[in-house]
Each structure stands twice: as C-alpha cells, then as structure tokens.
A protein has these predicted regions:
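Class I SAM-dependent methyltransferase SAM/SAH-binding core
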Residues: 68, 73-118
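A short glycine-rich, Lys/Arg-flanked "PGG" loop and its adjoining helix->strand segment in the class I
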Residues: 142-154
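Class I SAM-dependent methyltransferase Rossmann-like catalytic core
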Residues: 17-50
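Conserved beta-strand signature within the Rossmann-like core of class I S-adenosyl-L-methionine
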Residues: 155-163
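Conserved alpha-helix/loop element of class I SAM-dependent methyltransferases that forms part
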Residues: 45-63
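Core SAM-dependent methyltransferase catalytic element
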Residues: 216-235
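C-terminal alpha-helical "lid/dimerization" subdomain adjacent to the S-adenosyl-L-methionine
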Residues: 163-211
C-alpha cells in the first residue's frame, strides 16, 4: 500500500513537471504551448502589468507611429495595444528569437524571428521589453538598450518590465518568498515551483539597476519593476 502511494506521488510529480526542461529555454514546444497559462499562474500581476504597458503605449504613440515589441512571445502586448494601433493607424513589429513561440504568435503586426542582440531597430516611437532582459546575457543588455535609445524618436518611449535584484538581508529573502507565495496561491504546485526555480539557474538573471539611471519607475511588485524612458522632445 505504501509503495503504491509512493508510486502515485512520483507519477503526480512527473506529470506536473515533465514539461519543464532541465535548462530553461523558450526554444521548446512544450514551454511555448504552456507559456500563456503558466506565466499568469507564476506572475498573478501579469495582466495588470500588461494593461499598464498598454496605457503608456497609448500615452506616447503618435498617429502613424511604430511600436516595437521586443521579446514578443505569443503576442500578449500586440493584443493589448491593438485598439490604439487601430485608432492611430499605428504599426507593430514584434521580434522574438524562438521559432516555437513564433508558431503560436497571434499579436498582429509584422513578426520577425531574430535574436535581440543581432536585431538593429528601425526608427520607432515606442519600444516594449516585457519580461525579456532577464533572459539575455548580462554582457549584451547594455548594447540592446543603447541601440534603442539611439533609435527612439523624439517624444517617444522605451517601456520595460523586468526582474531586479532584491535588497540585501532578510527583507530581500522575504520579497523572494512573497514571489513564491504568489505562485502557490495562484495554484502552481510546489513541485512545479521547485523544478522551475532549478531550471532557471543560469538562464534567468536579474537586471542591474545601474542600466536604468535615466528611466522612471512606474510599477513595483516584489522582485519586479516597471520602468519607462521618455525620449526628449528635442534630440
């Protein structure tokens, strides 16, 4: 009886975690297929932050303007900003380096499959990087941000939502545990939380605050912040 219960427990554990790769990657069909539901379970504020991004796109997008959605995944931002794109005859270029994500993309606009490190942005009005930089090699993050600040139009904006380092000491520990608690309360199993945390080792690294000295904070939830760079009206 005890052996049967043990076997059942392992079967349940495997069924909950079998889709999680040993080394986290978005170049994975199972990850792409689970992405939309999983990210909302893991980050209960995901849709709230999406609405915030859409608000700032509306605030900075001129008529006939261009939005870049960099690290577009399956099209979350594209769908959120469709109303303002339609109202202002705006255009969208969505960029992602995962063929698996691209196969499920439904955010509208033009989809470009490219590594952000290699992507040279055209002149644009608004760029969005929504939970992207933490998955990019730290040595290459500044290059991406510098290119964007060079290419953004006068009066435009760069909008960031990403994970940042926790403060030192016990408060930092408590903030991280808040993130874990939010996941558990959203229905993510403890086994899935643990496997995902181990999978992310070396694959997801918080973004250094020093990269954003000229950005303004508009959101903070636990380990995550929303920032915006408003481009000067005269460049």
């Amino acid at each position: 009886m005890a052996e049967e219960a043990s076997n059942t427990a392992w079967e349940d554990y495997y069924s909950e975690t079998s889709w999680i790769p040993d080394q986290w990657t978005f170049h994975n069909k199972a990850v792409a297929e689970r992405f939309d539901g999983h990210v909302r379970e893991s980050l209960p504020w995901y849709d709230l932050a999406t609405k915030g991004v859409a608000h700032f796109v509306r605030a900075f997008l001129p008529d006939d303007g261009l939005v870049l959605d960099l690290g577009a995944s399956t099209g979350n931002i594209g769908k959120a900003i469709k109303p303002v794109l339609d109202e202002r005859n705006g255009s969208l270029i969505a960029v992602d380096n995962s063929e698996e994500m691209a196969a499920l993309y439904d955010g509208g606009g033009e989809l470009v499959v490219s590594d952000l490190v290699e992507y040279v942005p055209p002149r644009f009005d608004v760029a969005v990087l929504f939970l992207v930089l933490m998955f990019i090699d730290p040595k290459k993050r500044k290059l991406i941000l510098d290119r964007l600040q060079t290419a953004v139009s006068a009066g435009g904006a760069i909008i960031i939502v990403d994970r940042f380092p926790n403060p030192e000491g016990y408060v930092g520990e408590a903030i991280h545990r808040l993130t874990l608690r939010q996941k558990k309360d959203a229905g993510v199993s403890l086994s899935e939380i643990a496997e995902k945390e181990l999978s992310l080792v070396g694959r997801q690294r918080p973004v250094n605050n020093s990269l954003f000295d000229n950005y303004i904070e508009w959101l903070r939830v636990g380990e995550f912040r929303g920032l915006i760079y408003p481009s000067p009206e005269i460049l």
